[in-house]
């Protein structure tokens, strides 16, 4: 079967939920037996989001093969079974960087390098390459139609539609249909103008997804269809819902998947969304609730911890519990004290970079350890737990990470200086290395030690989890810390790097160097988060008595 392409654009305003809409459509098509993948094209000039501020851009999602990508790829993986890779996300910066590299190498034989055709050709080549072997490729373009930054991408997709044939392509445009309370009606004019903007660059949308806080009335849908030159059945009303996992059924109920299959002349069975119905049932019928404190550095923007937030919700679904997340700035722990942690059922310390707020995180780990509160540390959350234990239990009173104190006399956490990359080449790092693309990234095997809590939680001897870090446990000082009672429960495949630590005489204290949140999904959850939330409920129950 030849590959079919769905191009997703947004208009009127940003943050309409293009990624969620694209992922929801993909999940329906996948449920119809189609081989689907999703790509995200980001117009910013950064090569990737790896060095962008989490409080501006949100989290960096890491793929199996180690790509640092937009958080929308996390949505994609949570909605469909297909895994994302480096091919599923690229930016203007990456495109320009590659074109300039080819120009320096002489690939263009002295031609004058221009946006058209060189930049647009590079975009088209990457879209085609990323979609090889798929029945349907959904391509989301970041930003809003009318933005200068998006123009090369939109032009490339317009050309691609001509190249592969309009019968193999479909343009899906998300717009805002606002409700004006004083008029008592929704307004379609912004949608009409957004489509007009698309038409001005040569793109006629085939489907309109109309975002609103309420269902779009039939007469307004007819009006949109008439003035935007699309069939009425292709005007889809997408109202605000209480759960993003309700959107696949909402789109299916309006026949969007049928319209797509008809357009591409695909003969495939009806979608079975029973798994999503189970997710929604568990979400709507909890048997209790727990409150988990997330002590982080970027809590002013919850999207900085998007995958962690979702993984906690998934663990709630697994345990039939509502998970309430209380965000606490680790700097506030330093100034206001651990009283901010009172009343929590469990504590989670997520990843982060830099010294700011670290002592607050260390005090948080100490509070959880001393008060027997369930604790889950992720990445930096593991490193600070190790530092705390080394200082206050193992007698290494000057313990720290070389990330925070280069002259630390007891560096229990240090820079990884050498390892093999995915090609088998030895890579070397130093304090002077670039920040971008210089971490241990992607899926790595981890060996779990027999008789540990981690082994019990996972129920397996070997697991695969994704990493994003450049600092690791210093094995030189590890024996003294282990002698004081800390247990290493997970090691890298070569048994050289510490991946998981735990405290045996604590009800539930586990910290991992990797990022388990990146592989959690609403349908399957994740064992580490499921065990953590179950421990939170057990702690809550024991303190009610």
From Swiss-Prot:
Residues engaged in binding ATP: 15-20, 72, 239-241
Binding locations of L-glutamine: 352, 380-383, 403, 470
GO CC entries: cytosol
A Pfam family it matches: CTP_synth_N
Catalysed reaction, written as an equation: UTP + L-glutamine + ATP + H2O = CTP + L-glutamate + ADP + phosphate + 2 H(+); L-glutamine + H2O = L-glutamate + NH4(+); UTP + NH4(+) + ATP = CTP + ADP + phosphate + 2 H(+)
Enzyme Commission designation: 6.3.4.2
Keywords: ATP-binding, Glutamine amidotransferase, Ligase, Magnesium, Metal-binding, Nucleotide-binding, Pyrimidine biosynthesis
Glutamine amidotransferase type-1 domain sequence ranges: 291-542
Annotated signal peptide: none
PROSITE patterns xref list: GATASE_TYPE_1
Any GO molecular function: CTP synthase activity
Annotated binding of Mg(2+), by residue: 72, 140
Residues at which CTP binds: 14, 147-149, 187-192, 223
Pathway(s) per entry: Pyrimidine metabolism; CTP biosynthesis via de novo pathway; CTP from UDP: step 2/2
UniProt keyword Transmembrane helix present: no
Function, in words: Catalyzes the ATP-dependent amination of UTP to CTP with either L-glutamine or ammonia as the source of nitrogen. Regulates intracellular CTP levels through interactions with the four ribonucleotide triphosphates.
Note: CTPSs have evolved a hybrid strategy for distinguishing between UTP and CTP. The overlapping regions of the product feedback inhibitory and substrate sites recognize a common feature in both compounds, the triphosphate moiety. To differentiate isosteric substrate and product pyrimidine rings, an additional pocket far from the expected kinase/ligase catalytic site, specifically recognizes the cytosine and ribose portions of the product inhibitor.
Family indicated by similarity: Belongs to the CTP synthase family.
Subunit structure: Homotetramer.
Protein name according to UniProt: CTP synthase
